[in-house]
Amino acid sequence: MPIIVLVAFILYAITLSVALGRRGLPSASAATDGTAPAQRPRLLIVGATGGTGRQLVAQALDRGHEVTALVRNPSRLEIEHPRLRVLQGDVSDYASVEAAVRGQDVVVSALGHKRFFGPTRILSEGTRNLLRAMEAQGVARFICETSLGIGSSAGRMGLYYTLFVIPVILPFYFWDKTRQERLIAASSVEWVIVRPGVLTNQGKRGSYRHDPRVGSLIWTVHISRADVADFMLNQLESNTYLRTAPGVCW
């Protein structure tokens, strides 16, 4: 019986990985002109109190951007800067989302949550509101963090994540990320979906692999939140991955 259970579980994990791949975005050819407007765009950052979000805010300010952070609890964002505006709101509330999007040039999303053990649409419904507000306000570009393990990157977080973490701990979370990606791809905005490996709190190396096919089928791949933020902000000034979903890892 234990062998039967083990075989059944492995088949479930593989089936889930295949399903995430089929339901997610396919691999696509990246744009090649590599150019974007030279002017420093004004940024709205959502998910700004999370690990990647804090890095996005700090690094964007260091690069000279004007930054608006939409957060549920402003006291959790312990950054003060003359070019930082903090708005209290929730991505589930369209009115607060539209107010935050108004006047921006780019929206950068590092949305996340810790409600792993039940069905949820926090990511997808929040993203739906962001895209709706962007289209209403004429904001062109959207940079969004999701994860390796979805779409064409299914299975590329390594065996441990493919066979255990995703199917046992994070299946609902990854299904919602898959819905999130499909909403973005169906929108009219200029988008880049960034799929990182397993996130760490190490410092920024500034050197990492990025491509729609990065990752490993065997070994767990990692990258720091600081490097993910660096790569996401680089997409403000480049069209290389426009309307594609590159992975990023060390």
Where do the model's predicted regions map?
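Glycine/proline-rich active-site loop of Rossmann-fold NAD(P)-dependent oxidoreductases
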Residues: S152-A154, G203-R209, Q235-T244
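NAD(P)H-binding glycine-rich loop region in Rossmannoid oxidoreductase-like domains
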Residues: L43-L44, S75-N129, A133-A136, L236-T240
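Non-catalytic terminal and boundary segments that flank Rossmann-like NAD(P)-dependent oxidoreductase
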Residues: M1-P41
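Conserved catalytic-site region of short-chain dehydrogenase/reductase
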Residues: F116, L148-A154, L199-Q202
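Substrate-positioning beta->alpha
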Residues: L123-G126, D176, V194, I223-L233, ...
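N-terminal Rossmann NAD(P)H-binding glycine-rich loop of SDR-like oxidoreductase domains
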Residues: L43-R63
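Conserved beta-loop-beta element that borders a ligand/cofactor-binding pocket
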Residues: E181-Q202
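Conserved Rossmann-fold NAD(P)-dependent oxidoreductase catalytic core, especially the SDR/UDP-sugar
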Residues: L44, E66-T68, P74, R128-F172, ...
